[in-house]
């Protein structure tokens, strides 16, 4: 069945060097290769809607995590940390939903020493939503679900205030392809490969996706 699916793709990819070879031969970026493959399975509208649905879920997850305080369920008396981190970073600026929140963060002056705090806050927020049985995007797993949304949010609110749906879709397509290569050739399961099989893969996915939106080459 897998061979049949790969055969229908214009650019069948099992390994990273195959992906790079297609990029070089076709003079395309990774997101463009992924997009052409996706079009064999769903319409352009479906691709657009599904990618933005993923991002909406990620954004909502960060929003909920940053605005929920108290003790996490489970009986270990673990206190939520994202709420206080976020409160100290954003101050008293007004907003009413995840998207107005994103715009407000864009308007704040983010000092260099605060960048890592913001990224950590976003990632912790997702982890805490996961720990409290909330909805997260497995990217590539529940345990490492905070990395992709945190890095993409960093890009949108700190690095590129003009970025929008185009960059979000490119980021997610590249991240997904890199995660898929790991899943085909190794594992994304911490139970099988140790913690680095989760956080290591999600970090590689985020790094490759960041390279795309920052204008890097497929080789990079």
Where are these regions (language model features)?
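Surface-exposed loop/turn and secondary-structure junction residues enriched for glycine/proline
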Residues: 8-9, 14, 33, 139-140, ...
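Accessory "access/gating" subregions that flank catalytic or transport cores
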Residues: 45-194
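C-terminal catalytic subdomain
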Residues: 182-220
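Mobile "lid/hinge" segments at catalytic clefts and subdomain interfaces of large enzymes
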Residues: 1-45, 53, 217-220
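Phenylalanine-focused residue identity feature
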Residues: 9-11, 22, 35, 112, ...
């Amino acid at each position: 069945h897998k061979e049949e699916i790969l055969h229908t793709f214009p650019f069948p990819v099992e390994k990273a060097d195959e992906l790079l070879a297609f990029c070089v031969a076709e003079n395309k970026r990774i997101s463009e290769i992924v997009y052409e493959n996706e079009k064999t399975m769903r319409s352009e509208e479906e691709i657009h809607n599904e990618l933005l649905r993923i991002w909406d879920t990620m954004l909502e997850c960060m929003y909920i995590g940053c605005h929920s305080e108290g003790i996490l369920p489970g009986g270990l008396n673990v206190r939520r940390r994202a709420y206080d981190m976020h409160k100290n970073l954003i101050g008293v600026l007004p907003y009413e939903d995840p998207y107005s929140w994103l715009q407000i963060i864009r308007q704040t002056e983010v000092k260099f020493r605060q960048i890592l705090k913001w990224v950590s806050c976003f990632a912790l927020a997702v982890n805490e939503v996961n720990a409290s049985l909330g909805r997260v995007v497995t990217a590539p797993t529940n345990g490492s679900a905070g990395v992709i949304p945190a890095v993409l949010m960093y890009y949108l609110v700190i690095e590129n205030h003009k970025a929008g749906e185009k960059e979000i879709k490119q980021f997610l397509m590249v991240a997904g392809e890199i995660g898929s290569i790991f899943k085909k050739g190794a594992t994304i399961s911490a139970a099988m490969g140790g913690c680095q099989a989760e956080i290591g893969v999600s970090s590689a996915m985020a790094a490759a996706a960041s390279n795309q939106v920052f204008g890097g080459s497929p080789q990079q």
